């Protein structure tokens, strides 16, 4: 059983933006509600959803420091790190995983992987990681049309891999329109999602 109130108190020590805190709580509750539908442990889902943005308000230099410490543990492979170092914000999930180990003694690989990969996704990641990536994109407080479409796939169509694929389609399309860099993990993830969906 997860001690939800203590985890939320811990989250508030790291995040000061109330909208972001609300997003994390909403993601956690949404994941807990629908996890078992996709054969995912609901407690693991709650923790992943609640703490995925734990390091979002951390400075870039601290994100890099924490990320390097996490990589040294060799629990989860962090691909394209040299590239990501130029865009430290995308490593906030990796930094969050290191905080979770140090401060909360969370050492379950599946949870740590899901937090590491929630921003860009990745190739061949676990169902919990896939679910965290999707729910970060489509939790009920997300108020834009693509998120609502993915939400509907999760809630009404019961199709995890379709939701996963569409999350990438919307994410990559948005980056292309804005002429932003696409992290290679997202390309790997898209290809993996397409393969899973077409199985």
Region locations from a protein language model:
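Short, Lys/Arg-rich amphipathic segments at extreme N-termini
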Residues: 1-32, 189-192
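Divalent metal-dependent catalytic cores for phosphoryl transfer on phosphate-bearing substrates
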Residues: 7-15, 34-162
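Short, contiguous clusters of charged residues that form electrostatic/catalytic patches at enzyme active sites
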Residues: 25-29, 94, 98, 166
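Charged, low-complexity, helix-prone segments enriched in Lys/Glu/Asp/Gln
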Residues: 82-83, 148-152, 168, 187-194
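Helix-rich interaction surfaces within compact, conserved domain-sized segments
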Residues: 161-169
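Charged phosphate-binding loop/patch that engages nucleotide di/tri-phosphates or the phosphate backbone
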Residues: 170-199
